[in-house]
């Protein structure tokens, strides 16, 4: 395996960066941070009491776009609970919350230079696919026939 990694240039870079990577010491992260150390109770309206109504046109559109069969009661219940959860999240007040870019605020992330190391390897990549058509991957269809 090591011989295989040493042949490819991008694998050499990956193994070198792993050797140079420093360990994260979580005990060092005791500094003041924007992330609260204990959960904060958020007050937002409970929307679980309101019944979600979904018409058949919307269900058919979702089935066609997502290739998921929503005929069963269990699938509809899951869809309705997902909508209620999204509605709860939409009502959370985030007026005075600054955006968080990384949880490790005071620790630098090691990034490598973005360099193209290998190119024009379409044939090698397409060898990994089970089914191809005109130099494209063919993905298996979902549980709904595409003839609709």
Swiss-Prot record:
Transmembrane segments: none annotated. It is an enzyme of class 6 (ligase). Its main location: mitochondrion. Keywords: ATP-binding, Ligase, Mitochondrion, Nucleotide-binding, Protein biosynthesis. InterPro entries: Asp/Glu-ADT_sf_sub_c (IPR036113), GatC (IPR003837). GO terms for cellular component: glutamyl-tRNA(Gln) amidotransferase complex; mitochondrion. GO terms for molecular function: ATP binding; glutaminyl-tRNA synthase (glutamine-hydrolyzing) activity. Its EC number is 6.3.5.-. The keyword Transcription does not apply. It catalyses: L-glutamyl-tRNA(Gln) + L-glutamine + ATP + H2O = L-glutaminyl-tRNA(Gln) + L-glutamate + ADP + phosphate + H(+). It is found in: Mitochondrion. This protein may be expected to contain an N-terminal transit peptide but none has been predicted. Subunit of the heterotrimeric GatCAB amidotransferase (AdT) complex, composed of A, B and C subunits. HAMAP family: GatC. Belongs to the GatC family. This is Glutamyl-tRNA(Gln) amidotransferase subunit C, mitochondrial.
């Amino acid at each position: 395996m090591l011989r295989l990694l040493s042949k490819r240039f991008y694998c050499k870079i990956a193994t070198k960066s792993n050797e140079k990577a420093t360990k994260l010491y979580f005990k060092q992260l005791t500094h003041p941070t924007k992330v609260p150390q204990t959960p904060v109770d958020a007050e937002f309206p409970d929307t679980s009491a309101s019944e979600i109504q979904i018409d058949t046109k919307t269900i058919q559109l979702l089935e066609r776009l997502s290739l998921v069969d929503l005929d069963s009661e269990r699938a509809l219940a899951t869809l309705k609970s997902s909508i209620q959860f999204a509605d709860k999240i939409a009502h959370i007040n985030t007026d005075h919350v600054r955006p968080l870019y990384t949880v490790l605020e005071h620790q630098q992330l090691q990034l490598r230079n973005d360099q193209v190391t290998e190119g024009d390897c379409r044939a090698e990549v397409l060898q990994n696919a089970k089914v191809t058509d005109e130099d494209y991957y063919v993905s298996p269809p979902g549980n709904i026939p595409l003839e609709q």
